[in-house]
Amino acid sequence: MTTITPDEMKSLETLFMSETGTPSILLMEHAAQGVAAAISRHAPKSARVLFLCGPGSNGGDGYAAARLWCLGGGQADVWEVTSAVRGDALTNRTLALLYGVRVLPSVDAVDVAEYAAVVDALYGTGLNHAIEGDAAILIHRLNDHPQIPVIAVDIPSGLDGTTGRALGADVVRAAETVTFHRIKQGLLLRQGVEYTGEITVQPILIRPGDDIDLGFGGLEMLSPAALAPLFARTPALHKGDCGRAVIFCGSRGMVGAAAFCANACIRAGAGLTTLLCRESLLPMLQVLAPGATCVPLPETNGLLTPQAARITRETLDKADAACIGCGCGLTPDVTMLLRVFAEADCPIVWDADALTLLATHDGILPLKEEDIITPHPGEAARLLEQHVEFILDEPLDALSRLHDLCGCCVLLKGARTLVSDGDATYISLYGTPALAKGGSGDVLSGILTALLCQRNRLSTSLSTSALAACGVLIHALAGLRAEKRFGANCSTPQALIDTIRLDDKEL
């Protein structure tokens, strides 16, 4: 499944209606059916529901949905921006009144608390300015009643459908957004994450492949159902078939980062996991990550010796994939190993402290095409020498710049994590605040390393970005399982590891 922009959707609808002779009001009817179905998920069939209808086709969807709600046994009140609507919206307004929909005379007549649910059909994806006047007053009033579910039609009013940016101070906060044909890109970016609630895609007659034929790309989204067949194991499989992973993570005070990464790597299917560790950390890591073999790196006065570089190089020569960075520290001896990892033949996952060092040391970038960097917004800002606000405000631009700088697959962490190799771009539909805790990123790096080292077993045709997107999905689903068991506040990195699955079961 891929996203679509509002401009692309408009072109697609126009072409579809022209080629098939389908009237636009028929598309509107299918859209309204999806909205009416969504209302029934939040309110009883006989409930009284408020419909906020704007002057355009979004309002027309609202009038049609109000009629369908009345036909199903419910009660519908409409507040409208204006009664002077045209075209399909006028037709559906007329029909709505015939079927018992009541139009409220003014904004003062609207008491949001009287309704079981509210439908936001004020403004759609064509909006390009802040909402003002009575509509803004109503949106503010709606958002003051969070206990009343709001169903947004195609997109919450006040949100940019392409960028996800809030167009003003007043944006509808929806419990569910019913979007049509494909998810609009803006629902998944910036403030879109905050305002859209659950996203439901309603078909409106246009065939799923029609936009692909037009060359519309969009952000790609993976379904949990795609994981199980990809990671299925044959009965004769042995550990050598599942790859050898090498991890250099952890330092004094950050031993847990190495353990989380290694244990997640083992859990996610790596056949053999080896921890390169400072010799002073060896006793602790052998207890914290008993499933991993440990290769001690010699130290003098707390710093790795030049011999550590030789041992690291020899160990990486046997690896199918490797990871560096989680809690490894920022000391000069780590920079020495950074260069050894950059010269390795196997794909590398670069995370945390390794990214900070990449940002401050010349001569290492660009990396190999099959490598993966995993910055959060702060690390991305350091790499690009930008403010964090730029990363948050322009995530797709930041993603592109990071790829140009590093020459490899980029995994930009966030509420909607993005992955790109310069061609395909993936976005995660799944996530939970349970992941907002130190150590979650270490678990993700372990998962990614495990997938990379199993690449030959899985599919040599699978791109690095697709593999990384699978890792993000596995990590997110583990977060949802951990949240289900322990709650968003009480989940831990270890709980994530314990709930890692390479399929979509037990959600």
In which residue ranges do the predicted regions lie?
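Small-residue (G/A/S/T)-rich helix-start motifs and N-terminal tracts that mark the onset
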Residues: 1-80, 176, 187-349, 356-372, ...
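Short beta-alpha junction loops
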Residues: 82-85, 156-157, 280, 354
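Nucleotide and nucleotide-moiety/phosphate-recognizing core
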Residues: 36-122, 130-153, 337, 363
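Internal gly/pro-rich beta-alpha loop/helix module
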Residues: 116-117, 122-217
